[in-house]
């Protein structure tokens, strides 16, 4: 695994991905069409300063992803600078959308390879980055749910029906990946299953590649997880990242005059459940599951037009603006790589 070819998608693939994004956006607009006048009116209440503040909070998400990436990669490359960690986060954000949900790790692995980290360890470290993110999502939602369960059960019992599925998916991913990383018996089982793949052509190449990735994943996980202070710092960064992300709906309620008496921590709970439940729903390039979960959670507390307005505010700041910034970040990161 020593490819240094750029992961930049072809023009055709880029246009296809952007077309899918535009189609999904069009579907959302079509669904909201009966309330579009109210949504537009609510968004028009935002001042320039409020809009810029919301964008800044939304952009904190990929920037903190970059800090986490920096902390993780420094376990193998001690002189890896913070700016390159942020560049790596832009790679992941841009790749996730352009790759329709499957491009994050390949883009980041390629970037780290160009910065001196072999592909195998790069895949291992970025997989562990994903584990830390999922763990933070699980912990954040669980702590707030334990504190606020009586309140949400009294006001929105429908959401609670989806929590077992969300816990099964998120906890299953975490336990499965940690077991694959740390338990020799699971690693042996995975190797045994891989040997059932066809022994010819591209399947043979894939099997060898996956076996190599499995070995490096085991090595990198043992190395990183043994550094307890570093792991605590990484998890802490992810928790701060989620806290700031979940501030956006509270800001939207205040800025657009949609306040319904929800406290700051109640909004934090509702938004954490939105992200948590979305993990149990299918999505394309990060769209679909969040929108569905958001309306499911907030519909018990806001009228339809208000919940849709808040959703548009939230996604404009946390998804569309972030993707646009990642396109710029991706281009600048490639330029810096080409300059050496």
Task: Tell where the protein language model's regions lie, with residue ranges.
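Alpha-helical transmembrane segments of multi-pass membrane proteins
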Residues: 83-92, 128, 265-276, 305-314
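Membrane-interface interhelical connector segments
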Residues: 192-225
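Transmembrane helix-loop-helix hairpins in multi-pass inner-membrane proteins
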Residues: 1-41, 92-203, 283, 287-340
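Transmembrane helical segments that form the transport core of multi-pass membrane transport proteins
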Residues: 221-274, 281
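Membrane-interface helix starts
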Residues: 13-16, 45-54, 222-236
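A short amphipathic helical element positioned immediately N-terminal to and/or at the very start
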Residues: 38-45, 112, 213-226
């Amino acid at each position: 695994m020593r490819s240094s070819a750029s992961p930049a998608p072809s023009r055709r693939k880029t246009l296809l991905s952007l077309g899918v994004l535009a189609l999904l956006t069009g579907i959302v607009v079509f669904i909201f069409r009966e309330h579009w006048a109210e949504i537009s009116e609510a968004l028009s209440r935002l001042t320039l300063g409020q809009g810029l503040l919301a964008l800044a909070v939304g952009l904190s998400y990929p920037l903190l992803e970059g800090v986490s990436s920096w902390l993780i990669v420094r376990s193998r490359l001690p002189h890896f600078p913070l700016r390159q960690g942020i560049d790596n986060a832009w790679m992941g954000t841009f790749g996730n959308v352009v790759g329709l949900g499957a491009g994050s790790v390949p883009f980041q692995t390629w970037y780290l390879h160009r910065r001196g980290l072999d592909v195998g360890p790069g895949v291992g470290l970025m997989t562990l980055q994903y584990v830390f993110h999922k763990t933070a999502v699980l912990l954040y939602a669980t702590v707030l749910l334990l504190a606020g369960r009586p309140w949400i059960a009294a006001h929105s019992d429908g959401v609670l029906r989806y929590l077992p599925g969300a816990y099964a998916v998120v906890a299953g991913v975490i336990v499965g990946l940690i077991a694959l990383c740390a338990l020799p018996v699971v690693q042996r089982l995975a190797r045994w299953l891989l040997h059932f793949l066809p022994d010819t052509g591209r399947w043979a190449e894939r099997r060898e590649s996956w076996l190599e990735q499995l070995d490096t994943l085991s090595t990198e996980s043992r190395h990183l997880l043994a550094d307890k202070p570093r792991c605590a710092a990484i998890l802490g960064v992810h928790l701060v990242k989620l806290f700031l992300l979940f501030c956006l709906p509270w800001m939207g309620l205040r800025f657009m005059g949609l306040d319904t008496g929800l406290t700051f921590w109640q909004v934090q709970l509702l938004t954490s459940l939105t992200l948590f439940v979305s993990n149990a729903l299918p999505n394309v390039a990060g769209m679909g599951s969040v929108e569905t979960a958001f309306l499911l959670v907030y519909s018990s507390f806001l009228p339809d037009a208000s919940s849709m307005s808040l959703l548009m505010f939230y996604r404009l700041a946390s998804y569309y603006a972030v993707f646009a910034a990642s396109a710029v970040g991706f281009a600048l990161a490639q330029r810096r790589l080409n300059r050496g």
